[in-house]
């Protein structure tokens, strides 16, 4: 971790930190700095893992296109089936939220039916009671 920093440099940094921060705040400062370093390492590792995964996916796509260009007619049925499964998996990853045409035509949840009983209003009676 400290490739270019020797023991004397670390000792000097520790003494300066002790003088500047004091013995009460130095352990807290060291803990917060190590927490930041851990968070940065975690973030860098997650970015690296995502990039590696994307590169693997791109390599699979390139291999699939290369196999298609060489001709799929000469392949065995098992290999053809696995390529078809790979294509389906790639399409499902690329478009996970795409709906089928059959799902668009038929709603999954039916709207509630309105069963409101109509009551006749007696507007003439209310006006006559208020007026007289």
Curated annotation (Swiss-Prot):
Membrane-spanning segments: 2-22
Membrane disposition: Single-pass membrane protein
Main localisation: membrane
Region (Disordered): 86-132
Keyword Acetylation: no
GO CC, any one term: TAT protein transport complex
Biased composition annotated in UniProt, kind: Polar residues: 86-95, 116-132
Pfam families in the cross-refs: TatA_B_E
Residues annotated as signal peptide: none
GO biological process, one term: protein transport by the Tat complex
Origin: domain of life: Bacteria
Compartments in which it is found: Cell inner membrane
Alphabetized InterPro entries for the sequence: TatA/B/E (IPR003369), TatB (IPR018448)
One example GO MF annotation: protein transmembrane transporter activity
Family annotation (Gene3D superfamilies): 1.20.5.3310
Keywords annotated in UniProt: Cell inner membrane, Cell membrane, Membrane, Protein transport, Translocation, Transmembrane, Transmembrane helix, Transport
Subunit structure comment from the entry: The Tat system comprises two distinct complexes: a TatABC complex, containing multiple copies of TatA, TatB and TatC subunits, and a separate TatA complex, containing only TatA subunits. Substrates initially bind to the TatABC complex, which probably triggers association of the separate TatA complex to form the active translocon.
NCBIfam families: tatB
Functional summary from the UniProt entry: Part of the twin-arginine translocation (Tat) system that transports large folded proteins containing a characteristic twin-arginine motif in their signal peptide across membranes. Together with TatC, TatB is part of a receptor directly interacting with Tat signal peptides. TatB may form an oligomeric binding site that transiently accommodates folded Tat precursor proteins before their translocation.
Family stated for the protein in its record: Belongs to the TatB family.
Listed name of the protein: Sec-independent protein translocase protein TatB
